[in-house]
UniProtKB/Swiss-Prot annotation:
It is found in: Cytoplasm. It holds the Pfam family TACO1_YebC_N. Keywords: Cytoplasm, DNA-binding, Transcription, Transcription regulation. HAMAP family: Transcrip_reg_TACO1 (MF_00693). The lineage of its organism: Bacteria, Bacillati, Bacillota, Clostridia, Lachnospirales. This is Probable transcriptional regulatory protein EUBELI_00902. It comes from Lachnospira eligens (strain ATCC 27750 / DSM 3376 / VPI C15-48 / C15-B4) (Eubacterium eligens). InterPro entries: Integrase-like_N, TACO1_YebC-like_2nd/3rd_dom, TACO1_YebC_N, Transcrip_reg_TACO1-like, Transcrip_reg_TACO1-like_dom3, YebC-like. GO terms for biological process: regulation of DNA-templated transcription.
């Protein structure tokens, strides 16, 4: 699942034990299926599918696994699955968006509401927190994987249509509009750049600090329960999570 900040995805994509990878691949497989359902199996004519494929490749999903998932989705009836988004609040007014892909809306709603409640939060009305986030294409390039010149990478990204380029201690972040994500991702991939993550995501405009141990425990409780929920695909939040608390 996606995290709170611009660079949180690196921790998830590097995670690494087989169980974590299996869970990530399962979620990505569902995203592939819903993208095929919505726009067909031809990646050249389905922009949503192209975005999910880029996300899969950044997560190191094998190409044959991606191809099998697309073919399976094209041959199966996915009409019983639907995408549902929930918005709500965690401790100290933190904003949380939950994207679910489920074949049972009632089950998903019940489990997600329970996760919020157990962490001292609550599910709100549609739109109650989404205005606090920007929908952006985001690519993270790990400095351990890319040893070239930062200025060259920046110019390559900007020339391809990126909106912004940020450098952190261990990675570079490239931001695009959702519409330009495909073009920028392809241009960088063609230049041999590999990604720690690459996806269209929700990025918080500002972040919230949690200073009390109780609030931190409650927030981790919410996020942990959502992470365990098979219906949940992505979680976005604006908690300025301390680095040592990331996995």
């Amino acid at each position: 699942m996606s995290g709170h900040s611009k660079f949180a995805n690196i921790a998830h994509k590097k995670a690494a034990n087989d169980a974590a990878k299996g869970k990530i691949f399962t979620r990505l497989g569902k995203e592939l299926m819903i993208a095929v359902k919505e726009g067909g199996p031809d990646v050249n004519n389905n922009s949503k599918l192209r975005q999910v494929v880029a996300k899969c490749k950044a997560a190191n999903m094998p190409n044959d696994t991606i191809d099998r998932a697309i073919k399976k989705a094209a041959s199966n009836d996915m009409s019983n699955y639907e995408s549902v988004t929930y918005e709500g609040y965690g401790p100290n007014g933190t904003a949380i968006i939950v994207e679910a892909l489920t074949d049972n809306r009632n089950r998903a709603a019940s489990n997600i509401r329970s996760a919020f409640t157990k962490g001292g939060g609550n599910v709100g009305t549609p739109g109650c927190v989404s205005f606090m986030f920007d929908n952006k294409g985001q690519m993270i390039v790990d400095k351990e994987e890319y040893t070239g010149d930062a200025d060259e990478l920046m110019m390559l990204a900007l020339d391809a249509g990126a909106d912004d380029f940020n450098e952190e201690e261990d990675c570079y972040e490239i931001l695009t509009s959702p519409e330009e994500f495909d073009a920028v991702n392809q241009a960088l991939a063609d230049a041999g750049v590999t990604f720690a993550s690459a996806e269209v995501t929700m990025i918080p405009q500002t972040t919230v600090d949690l200073t009390s141990e109780d609030d931190i425990k409650k927030m981790n409780r919410i996020l942990g329960l959502l992470d365990e929920d098979d219906d949940v695909q992505n979680v976005y939040h604006n908690w300025n999570e301390p680095e040592e608390d990331e996995e």
